Amino acid sequence: MSDSPDSPPNGTAFANPAVPVDLAAAAAALPDMWAPRVVAAVNGQYVKVARVQGEFVWHDHAAEDELFLVLRGRLRLDFEDRPAVTLGPGECYAVPRGVRHRPVAEAEVLLALFEPAATRHTGDVVTDRTRTVAEQLGA
């Protein structure tokens, strides 16, 4: 196995993009809230799923855009410099690089995230909820 962004590092595994992935089922099976897992990779981007509830930390990604796709539930994205956006099932929103944001889920939400492989979970902010890329790969 190669260590390119389109294949998992040695000793880790995620879904083969050539095989269908049920994103909602993969997210629902996650044991922990706010702990995304990589399910596929394409063109240097990771496709991640997560199960979330409550408020996440304020953070930004200085060099990367981040796309949120709600699979089940309703997710609010709070911003410091613009009105909040609320997403329902099947809706997505791309948070531009450098924009501070905070995802909020009043009830459990299943979501998919699309972002460059190098994107750090909470940007430069480190909390007990921060997951490394290796952890997101299941290492």
Language-model region placement:
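Actinobacteria-biased recognition of intrinsically disordered, low-complexity terminal regions
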Residues: M1-N10
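Structural motif
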Residues: Y46, E55, L67, R74-R76, ...
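Short glycine/serine/proline-enriched coil/turn segments at secondary-structure junctions
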Residues: H59-D60, R102-P103
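Short acidic-glycine-tyrosine-enriched beta hairpin
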Residues: D81-R97
